[in-house]
Amino acid sequence: MSLETSTTTPAGSPLSDRELDLIDKYWRAANYLSVGQIYLLDNPLLKEPLSAEHVKPRLLGHWGTTPGLNLVYAHLNRIIRNRDADVIYVTGPGHGGPGLVANAYLEGTYSEVYTGIEEDAEGLRKLFRQFSFPGGIPSHVAAQTPGSIHEGGELGYALVHAYGAAFDNPYLVVACVIGDGEAETGPLAAGWHSNKFLNPVTDGAVLPILALNGYKIANPTVLARIPHTELEALLRGYGYRPITVAGDDPTDVHRQLAAALDEAFDDIAAIQGVARGGGEVQRPVWPMIVLRTPKGWTGPKVVDGKRVEGTWRSHQVPLAETHDNPEHRAQLEEWLRSYGPEQLFDDDGRLRAELRALAPTGDRRMSANPHANGGLLLHDLDLPDFRDYAVPVTRPGSVTHEATRVLGTFLRDVIARNKDRFRMMGPDETASNRLDAVYGATEKVWLSATEPDDEHLAPDGRVMEVLSEHLCQGWLEGYLLTGRHGLFNCYEAFVHIVDSMLNQHAKWLATSRELPWRRPIASLNYLLTSHVWRQDHNGASHQDPGFIDLVANKRAELTRVYLPPDGNTLLSVADHCLRSRDYINVIVAGKQPALAYLDMDAAIAHCTRGLGIWDWASTARSIGAEPDVVLACAGDIPTLETLAAADILRRELPDLAVRVVNVVDLMRLQPDSEHPHGLPDREFDALFTRDRPVIFAYHGYPWLIHRLTYRRANHAQLHVRGFKERGTTTTPFDMVMLNDLDRFHLVIDVLDRVEGLASRAAMLRQRMVDARLAARMYTREHGEDDPAIANWTWEPSERNSRSE
């Protein structure tokens, strides 16, 4: 367990000649199946010479990384059998999909999951035909692949997913292959630091395997071209002990890799044994493997006079014209026959018994490990009753609170009751986001050195903080995919850093929902706070509500967006999201002192509906009476400004019939034909009318509301105010004025939109224009908002006090 680097040698190999021969054949079988998937439509066992009819007309797939993935898989199987180890396999180079499909088939799992693909010659034909073929399976290690928790299409997340899977899984080892191209990405570079958060007592282990095959699509890789001493120094600096395996002779590499894996697993067992024996938990130096083998190994060495094996040319399809080019087709047949398929499969196309015996059985197969189908292991959270954390509200808009601070007390007890299955992630923002009540039940995970002034750091904390949104999301995804629960809290503007990760997770969920053998997992829950309307102190760089738009673009059955206006609605929404499965939930809530509007019973009813009329804030109250105008709002600050506008209107224009509608569940605005939460037209029209002006104050970019409602009968009368990319360092009210979302402008919108009102209320309009000017002048003179604006509360009028 020292920091010295060791390179294994054949002399120390634990393999007998017989074992080596069998492992080599198993590797050849996986390689044969991989090549067959890329190229063949028929003739899977080469019972006759290859013809054009046997070859796919359109070749898709990636060969270059695949033999390396198959090599590691075969050797991990030996480790699992010999040690009864619990191992899952994460493949960063996910474009090596044919290799993982091949290994799942060799282990028998594939035929168990997809019963139409039998373990015989016809099953092989179907296996080959379906790969990267219309109506078949994709080219990457997607959700369709048994044993996968990581598609590896978009590069950078393999290592962080692996660590997420290992947290709170003390007996699991996650073998994670990292491509040397992927190692150039930012998330992967940060991911090496995950070992500083891995507790050897309560967590499992991650074994990184850096696959140095030297090339990306068309370029060399950085880590393959720096001196090996420099590479090892880099990895030691990250806190790992690298064990190097290098070569291009299969026999030599087999012996090296077997010894390297034995050494690594011995090291892991020793680290965990010491840590679990008692005493102070310290950060260990974990082993890892550097595997330097040729790209496209065992494939064609030269094609059309150009080197292929060991170069970038082997990345995808080394022989690209096999359907129409007889020379390429002959070379493909030679390549396939080089694996000796008659030595690997019997006459019926079944893997020979002595090779099948090399694979683990049951749940120990990496392709059948339940950790890679996390819904099988998922247990409900033991949630406290969120109603016990309610903000007392005797009258709407009269009590001030901090919504996320209220939520923090609830999350504190969620953590206390679920110490083995719930974690909270944040990029150094948990306290800033007013969630620090959680430290009453736990600490922040930290295994590095500490200083006397540090607070809330411990090896066994349930809060994970690192200043990388990529790591926060990646850890959480790995944690969820292996059957646990969590929450990612983040500044609203900076969650955009993981936009693309959300895209990939949404694609995974969409696919897994269509697979009956994939069990539902806990939802990916985002809490976005420190939001656009209260980042007046940090300025434009911190002001961007566009993550909602990204989520709204995703498939309707996956996504939910909630904008609770106060603490009690936030509690109700959070409880709902933590209980949900297979969704991406986005909650946007404020952290600054704000008004509370609904008592808990009213909040629950409102959140259950997803939107509704706030009768106590409306003046259009008579049964059967149509409003003159609808004031709609979504988000805490738009709600505040809408209510303040309604207050002005009821005082200045008492005969104007105003209806206030608040929206919590944004997807309720869509028709029910477009989203499961969507409102039928008749219900939408009942709330928003078919012909009256609707002034909609919205938290984010206003055009999203138009997108969600464009099919509605009254869309032409819908006028939305929201964020228009006008921000700076200023006061809270100046921020809403910059974007025409302020109460005075909302009143002006009403006067301009309600037929016949503009001329009758011209003086009120002028006063609203003057009020905006006065508010701005006050900020320029005093550096803060006018107290009459900043301290506004809702006061009941005689007309509607009865409902309050």
Swiss-Prot record:
<dbReference type="InterPro" id="IPR019790">
    <property type="entry name" value="Xul5P/Fru6P_PKetolase_CS"/>
</dbReference>
<dbReference type="GO" id="GO:0000287">
    <property type="term" value="F:magnesium ion binding"/>
</dbReference>
<dbReference type="Pfam" id="PF03894">
    <property type="entry name" value="XFP"/>
</dbReference>
<dbReference type="InterPro" id="IPR018970">
    <property type="entry name" value="Xul5P/Fru6P_PKetolase_N"/>
</dbReference>
<dbReference type="GO" id="GO:0016832">
    <property type="term" value="F:aldehyde-lyase activity"/>
</dbReference>
<dbReference type="Pfam" id="PF09364">
    <property type="entry name" value="XFP_N"/>
</dbReference>
<dbReference type="InterPro" id="IPR023962">
    <property type="entry name" value="Phosphoketolase"/>
</dbReference>
<dbReference type="InterPro" id="IPR019789">
    <property type="entry name" value="Xul5P/Fru6P_PKetolase_ThDP_BS"/>
</dbReference>
<dbReference type="Pfam" id="PF09363">
    <property type="entry name" value="XFP_C"/>
</dbReference>
<dbReference type="InterPro" id="IPR018969">
    <property type="entry name" value="Xul5P/Fru6P_PKetolase_C"/>
</dbReference>
<keyword id="KW-0456">Lyase</keyword>
<dbReference type="InterPro" id="IPR005593">
    <property type="entry name" value="Xul5P/Fru6P_PKetolase"/>
</dbReference>
<keyword id="KW-0786">Thiamine pyrophosphate</keyword>
<protein>
    <recommendedName>
        <fullName>Probable phosphoketolase</fullName>
        <ecNumber>4.1.2.-</ecNumber>
    </recommendedName>
</protein>
<dbReference type="InterPro" id="IPR029061">
    <property type="entry name" value="THDP-binding"/>
</dbReference>
<dbReference type="InterPro" id="IPR009014">
    <property type="entry name" value="Transketo_C/PFOR_II"/>
</dbReference>
<dbReference type="GO" id="GO:0005975">
    <property type="term" value="P:carbohydrate metabolic process"/>
</dbReference>
<comment type="similarity">
    <text>Belongs to the XFP family.</text>
</comment>
